[in-house]
């Protein structure tokens, strides 16, 4: 999965600066940003900046394209886990346009990216963090075989000044994940 890969309903591919308008379309949705821990984008320039600094040219980060309508509907990736010093550990993160929630699309994308993380990236562990109220994200992780690891009280200062608890989930390479 160096370039792109397809699932039944999705195309996962590297992001480019030309994706800015599509990224802005879902990044300005209030429920997308707030559940992912970032301020909803207020301008196209914010999305362009995020693409340049966070997404473009990064190994393990992909745009999620819905094959039926051809739209870029989200992002997913595995990066270094800032809460762990293990060099063989990564952290799964994702965001998707709210109009595509509840269809199993993020689970489909996550399963593909996890295969990449444990195979191509040679990771031994992938973690994921979500807010306790984010039941949809927890469900994605559970369907991918993640185990609940613990509660991190007041672990994140969100963009709006709220001090947020997080729940941590973990998936080990030697434990099979659900497909």
Segments predicted by a language model, with ranges:
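A short helix-loop-beta-strand connector motif used in the catalytic cores of GNAT acetyltransferases and
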Residues: 51-63
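Conserved GNAT-fold acetyl-CoA-binding loop/helix
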Residues: 31-52
């Amino acid at each position: 999965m160096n370039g792109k890969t397809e699932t039944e309903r999705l195309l996962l591919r590297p992001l480019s600066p030309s994706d800015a308008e599509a990224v802005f379309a879902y990044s300005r949705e209030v429920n997308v940003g707030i559940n992912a821990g970032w301020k909803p984008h207020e301008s196209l320039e914010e999305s362009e900046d995020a693409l340049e600094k966070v997404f473009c040219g990064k190994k393990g980060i992909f745009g999620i394209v819905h094959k039926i309508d051809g739209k870029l509907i989200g992002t997913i990736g595995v990066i270094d886990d800032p809460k762990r010093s293990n060099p063989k550990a990564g952290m799964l993160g994702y965001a998707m346009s709210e109009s595509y929630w509840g269809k199993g699309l993020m689970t489909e994308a996550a399963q593909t990216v996890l295969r990449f993380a444990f195979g191509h990236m040679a990771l031994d562990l992938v973690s994921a963090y979500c807010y306790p109220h984010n039941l949809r994200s927890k469900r994605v992780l559970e369907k991918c075989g993640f185990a609940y690891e613990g509660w991190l009280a007041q672990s994140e200062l969100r963009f709006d000044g709220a001090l947020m608890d997080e729940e941590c989930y973990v998936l080990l390479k030697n434990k099979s994940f659900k497909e």
